[in-house]
Swiss-Prot record:
Record's keyword terms, sorted: Cytoplasm, Elongation factor, Protein biosynthesis
Keyword Cytoplasm among UniProt keywords: yes
Family note: Belongs to the EF-Ts family.
SUPFAM superfamilies xrefs: Elongation factor Ts (EF-Ts), dimerisation domain (SSF54713), UBA-like (SSF46934)
Protein name per Swiss-Prot or TrEMBL: Elongation factor Ts
Signal peptide: none
GO molecular function: translation elongation factor activity
Protein's cellular compartments: Cytoplasm
Keyword Lipid metabolism: no
CDD domains: UBA_EF-Ts
Matching InterPro entries: EF-Ts_dimer_sf (IPR036402), Transl_elong_EFTs/EF1B (IPR001816), Transl_elong_EFTs/EF1B_dimer (IPR014039), Transl_elong_Ts_CS (IPR018101), UBA-like_sf (IPR009060)
Amino acid sequence: MAITAAQVKELRDRTGAGMMDCKKALTETDGDIELAIDSMRKSGAAKAAKKAGNIAAEGTILIKNGEGYAALLEVNCQTDFVAKDANFLAFANAVLEVAAASKVTIEDLKAQFEETRIALVTKIGENINVRRVEYIDGANLASYRHGERIGVVVAGEADEETLKHVAMHVAASKPEFVNPEDVPADLVERERALQIEIAMNEGKPAEIAEKMVFGRMKKFTGEISLTGQAYIMEPKKTVGAILKEKGATVSNFVRLEVGEGIAKKEEDFAAEVAAQIAATKA
């Protein structure tokens, strides 16, 4: 049977798929829109499965406050171009709304939005991944987003401006812990053992080596903790000193950055071109 423009439009409106894909599905199902939708869903799932192996290390970090807490969400795609796409961002924001409403786990978020994700993968042509969601509790919360790629929420007892500035510091300086004493004992001991070995290899006497290690360990725990770091807005003071001056405290923070921990494929374009030239000469 002949497929009409009205049928194609209806299928496009309901699925968001391209015109040619809609026409193809309608032709294969003799104009039955419901069967065409089922066919496209099956086809989309197959396409999404193929795309699943593609590295998705671009994307966005989103933040939204709930009642006494905030949600931070990372959704990934393959390219920074798609990371700015309106359909991709609408999907990410829809996931965030559900997460922020009731602290939904990442597993439940993935399951709830899997069908929508598959449809988006089919439409956009890239692997899309709802990667992680983090929640932070607190009566006083301040958030900061650096572009689309970094999101920070800080919880503490301080005025809004102070917490906001601390959130900006966290975005820039990447602390791992709030205070030096929060650094896990096993991490401290591993670093201490390494520093002792380094000092001994330098030929230092044991007593001097011990003093050197003490100083290095203080520096180590300070550099990876928020309150021990030099404050980006007043580098001669630590964040801890600034907070003390203001009678403020920070109890927790969460920092997410797009793609952190994802191994990206390194592209060697020179080698690729050389290989293509060699192939043409073969």
